[in-house]
Amino acid sequence: MRNVIWLVLAMAGVQCAAAQEITAAPALMQLHVQAQAGFKELVCDPRAPSRRPPTAQNPDPMEMPDPDMLPVRVKRPAQTDTAEGLPARRGTLPPSFRPNFPGQPYRMAIWGDSHLAAGFFSEELVKQLNVPGDAVSNVLLPANMGRAGVRLPIRRSCVSPQWKYEPGYLGRDNATAPGPGLMNMFSDQPDSTLAWDVRKDAKAAGYERVRILYQQTGAPVHLAISVDGGAEQPVILDGQEGPAVLELLAGQPISQVRLRLVAGALRFQGLELSSPQAHPFEIDVFGYPGATVAGWKSADIDYLRRWFIQRPYQLVMLEFGTNEGNAAPFNLAAYRNTLTESVRNMRTVFPTATCILIAPGDRGVLVPRSVNTRRRKAGRLPDIDLMRFATIHAEIGRTQREVAEEAGCIAWSMQDAMGGRGQSYYWAQQTPAWMAKDLIHFTPAGYRQLAREFFMDMGWVPLPTPTARETLLRVDAPIL
């Protein structure tokens, strides 16, 4: 009997140790560097010209359908002002933000596709919250630098051509252990380089600590690190396998960092920027063009959650659906299964955070110019389903509402905020246009409009101006 008891205790000890290992923060290596003054502008190396042959001009280009082919327009309820001068709330949710808890920052994170990667939606949310620019900190940056369609809150990024992107949503083995943004950048080519000017603009200060996030493997990796144009410092990354951090420490703000791969294979997983000043509001935006929610399904959750052990979020948002709806044929049952499992994994990583699922906007269909020409001559409408993607996006929005309710989250639909199915055609006709010419994406003005709609539908209110710099935020709505 005693042997059985000892065996049980021993097994419990092993399980406890395993749990501690799983929940341990990433391994940390520190490198003291010397920040410099009077450094030169960061200039990226010119890319080699594309070898693709020039494409012939399309004799029958795609364009907007003629106006009389479009569905009946539906408008959202008119916005009115309250006695306080704030936009009237259309949603029934309680206000999500209230000043409280001095000394504790409010942290928000949002994962998404190209709609988030552009950065305009999140920037407008910060503006609507009335948070001063110097009180907002984007401290976690995903490994998406250099990717077309990505805007980051740093001045410049330079990526040499040897780096390969490993987005998690593709489900490949090399991306199952991702960085915080559910993606990696990989190179095993000597002299591959990454460089950043981490300042927000030329007049802004840098950061006293710059953390390079990476995956430590069993093989050592040799790097050379340069700060603010100074001499390279050799670094050998070697340690326990798993998520790891190389922290650059300086006595004054760091503005520029250059990383060169000397030998080995590096899986870069993001940047963390830190300064000694407390920031009352932190919003981390993890957007990647082409992404789907499947990145949350395929990720090794035990690996992923270690990035956030010391970074609890009060609010987590997932903005996906546009790329899922582009699949042909679209399988709603398969989408529901993927979404359900992905949201379950997200809730495993952030069990106490308020969560919001954001469904895609309306999407239109372009037609060949010849179709519009023939229609004008024949006087009858062509047999083209202009509501094909609008209908799919409506199904995705409905599914997200159902899955959100099951998971204890909130759901919000860009398409509903636009006025429903078919509104992409009319958003494209706004002045300035709110819809991009592809009828899939939005213009900067369109993203800002969506952010304003989201802000009002959530029942959020701006922070009081006099105390915005000192006031910290919390979620006033119950944890769902």
Give the predicted meaning of each segment.
Residues E21-P67, P71-T80, G85-L86, N138-P243, ...:
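Conserved catalytic region of serine esterases and O-acyltransferases that act on ester linkages
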